[in-house]
UniProtKB/Swiss-Prot annotation:
Entry keyword Transcription: yes
Known role: Participates in transcription elongation, termination and antitermination.
Entry keyword set: Transcription, Transcription antitermination, Transcription regulation, Transcription termination
Family: Belongs to the NusG family.
GO biological-process terms attached to the record: DNA-templated transcription termination; regulation of DNA-templated transcription elongation; transcription antitermination; transcription elongation-coupled chromatin remodeling
Lineage, top ranks: Bacteria, Bacillati, Mycoplasmatota, Mycoplasmoidales, Mycoplasmoidaceae
This protein's record includes keyword Transcription: yes
GO CC annotation: cytosol
CDD domains to which the protein is assigned, alphabetical: NGN_Bact_1
UniProt protein name: Transcription termination/antitermination protein NusG
Superkingdom, natural source: Bacteria
SUPFAM superfamilies given in the database record: N-utilization substance G protein NusG, N-terminal domain (SSF82679)
SMART domains according to UniProt: NGN
Length: 316
């Protein structure tokens, strides 16, 4: 066999199911069979996209969730507007993945018979062999695997299964979304009619949107007591065992909740707004309240609220 035939080449393979699942499972299969030297790498090429949506205090609509996640970020723009950034990633080739391998009958058999892979480009027809990428495209792919995009306006993030390309003016060196200064200082239009989310001023938002009775209920149930930097007084905080009546359909039932510091809980701010948080402290005596750390938009807050506003997080 000639030396050129022992050099791994990049091939393109169409997939019929989720691309990254195929890549992950194929890598595991290659490892299990000991074919790492023949099938060198498998990757999907993706592009990260951003969808921005501004929520306004004037609309009166509150989002169901205020939680920051990897692909969902909240930012405070000003006293009235809040920015939701939804991040998504799509396959730049559609339903195709890249496979780097030294072609052999065995390697080809592993790839073409793998669940989710429907062939390799160029291999259709009796006796046809797969066609590798041309030198230019292969070199571009190798450059991206070094974290360098062929487009100077793009940034590259590498994972075990993917090469992810993104705009460098939207994501920093740590691949975090960049909030533009002009977004933060832009004032809302008087006729703006979008939706609302709040961070530091969540309480004020509720006051403006609810009637006076609901305002009093909110004020009683949950008030922001201090920032995350403020220290709690441990002398008044101890683990607590509470027993409360809760409404289950049309019947009142008693349910025992045993909360401890460190528990991950669901915080019921209103009937429709629930966020997850972690118990940082529990009050001594008959106060029956907890200090819970929650994340609203890009801010972390400690709130003080009754234990009946908490429930344990249910994991599927």
């Amino acid at each position: 066999m000639q030396a050129s035939e022992l050099t791994p080449k990049w091939y393109v393979a169409p997939v019929s199911i989720k691309d990254e699942a195929v890549v992950k499972n194929l890598k595991a299969k290659i490892q299990a069979l000991g074919f790492n030297h023949e099938i060198v790498d498998v990757k999907v090429l993706k592009e990260r996209e951003v969808h921005e949506e501004v929520y306004s205090l004037k609309s009166g609509k509150l989002p169901r969730s205020l939680k920051n996640t990897t692909f969902n970020k909240w930012f405070v723009l000003d006293d009235y507007r809040y920015l939701r950034v939804k991040i998504s990633e799509k396959n730049l080739l559609g339903r195709y993945i890249y496979i780097k391998m030294i072609y052999s009958e065995d390697a080809w058999r592993i790839v073409r018979n793998f669940p989710g892979i429907t062939g390799i480009v160029g291999s259709s027809g009796r006796g046809a062999l797969p066609i590798p990428l041309d030198e230019k495209d292969a070199n571009n792919l190798e450059q991206m695997l070094k974290g360098i995009s062929i487009n100077p306006s793009k940034r590259i993030m590498l994972t075990n299964t993917a090469i992810i390309e993104m705009d460098s003016d939207k994501f920093d060196e740590k691949f975090q979304y960049i909030l533009k200064q002009k977004q933060a200082i832009q004032k809302p239009k008087e006729d703006e009619d979008s939706e609302i989310v709040d961070a530091e001023k969540l309480k004020e938002a509720f006051k403006k949107l609810q009637n006076s009775q609901e305002q009093d209920e909110w004020k009683e149930k949950a008030t922001i007591i201090q920032s995350e930097q403020t220290k709690l007084d441990p002398s008044v905080l101890v683990p607590f065992l509470g027993k409360y009546e809760i409404l289950d359909t049309d019947n009142k039932v008693e349910q025992l909740f045993e909360f401890s510091v460190g528990n991950l809980v669901e915080v019921h701010l209103t009937d429709t707004i629930h966020v997850q948080g972690q118990i940082k402290a529990l009050y001594q005596g008959t106060v029956n309240k907890a200090v819970v750390e929650i994340e609203l938009t890009s801010k972390t807050q400690l709130i003080n609220l009754p234990l009946e506003n908490l429930s344990f997080v249910e994991f599927e």
